[in-house]
Amino acid sequence: MPGKKGNMSMAHYVNYGNEKIDFLLPKGWNLISAEDKPPVPGVADSLQEIRRALDHPIGSPKIEDLARPGMEVALLFDDLQRPTPVHLALPEILNRLNRAGIPDNRISGICSLGTHPIPTLEQLKKKVGEEVFSRLQGRIFPHDPHASDNVIIGRTHRGTLVEINPRVAFSDLIIGVGECMPHPTAGFGGGYKIIMPGVCSYRSVASHHFTWMRHRNSKVNLLDGNSFYEEIVDAGRLSRLAFKLDFIINDKKEVIRAFAGNPIAEHREASHYSASLYTIPLSKLADVTITSAFPLEVGVQATKALTMAGFCTRSGGAIIWVAPQKEAGSIMPLIKEMGSSESASDFHRRLIQGDVPDHLKSFGISYIMQVVYFKELAEKFRVVHVTEGLSPEQVKMMKFSYSSRLQEAINQVSEKMPKADVAVFPSGGNIIPEVK
């Protein structure tokens, strides 16, 4: 999808697949940011980085010092939607538990998938690797959020019922492995999210997520005062998660850095480090934001760039969202629901009451939340979607405008907004826009 040049101001670009799209801004548009975060290289030796983190835990004794002979241990790891190098981390953790007197036959592995689809045994084997699959033969389980034997362990201080996987509830020592990345509602992923939503029941996750998803402080790059995050911490504490290993991972799925230790302490440091990599400061809210989904361009992941753009665009402004949508099958149910006349708030109320549309029930709760966010974006902004993978009719069902070319989209918006403060995010899929 090439750019188109005209008699305008200087050229800019966004990343699109393996190419760059050049474009020109109208002369009445004032650029307030066009920062493109450079790629961050991975460490030379991922296993060495894992060992370093485990040898120097933050706010916690080492795993070897937490473990006692006779303990039953639950090792929690994230699902196939995350690039976390579980196959490297788990053998090292198993070896440390062995040295502390806990044999493999007293250790279970649990895939903390939240409400995502349950993986097959072969998919679990791919995630944990041959060695761990063999060592924990018959003791690697996917969490089932709908299981009748999930265990109620209490309520958060705000009243959310916390119901978790029985193998976690009845273990003596619980250790988690995951990834810390910017998260649009929890501030950052990682930490206690391995528990909530990771191993919680569907009704617990629905109660938490649907209740707090639109709170003003439920947003990226905010932990203190973020009710969505604070409820996750409450659930994690109730679960007794003792130790967490979180990774910062780049676009090439390489380990940048690992953090380990107390689930709150290590997550704070991991979040701070992640923010240092991805934050783009803005002096004001933009009238127009031009954002590319790159590098998260596949399926529902492509929506992250649009959500982030909403944080830094003024109400009534415009967002130009650029995404190839070459594998768009996974967002078709979202598009179908967007075609209804129901407002964001009315749809949200349905979810709170447990009335989830039948065609969305097989999807995870985070997917269903996207419908609310998209409806809200369509109500709050003029969104122009630049794509080649969706038809104009499909884009219009989302209440967005369609364009096949970026320069054409800019021209459309500039007709109604000849003067505007503009933010450009060439790689909008992995940024944290922060308005000062």
What are these regions (language model features)?
Residues 33-68, 275-276, 299, 311:
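N-terminal glycine-/serine-/threonine-rich phosphate-binding loop
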Residues 119-188:
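An acidic, phosphate/nucleotide-engaging active-site surface
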Residues 218-296:
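Membrane-embedded hairpin module used as a gating/binding unit in multi-pass transport
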Residues 6-53:
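N-terminal amphipathic/basic leader segments beginning at the initiator methionine
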Residues 72-83, 108-115, 289-292:
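Short glycine-rich or small-residue beta-strand-to-loop segments that form or flank ligand, phosphate
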Residues 98, 304-436:
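C-terminal non-catalytic interaction/assembly regions of soluble proteins
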Residues 58-74, 99-105, 280-287, 313-314, ...:
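Glycine-rich phosphate/diphosphate-binding loops that line cofactor/substrate pockets in enzymes
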Residues 170-252:
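Internal metal/ion-chelating core segments
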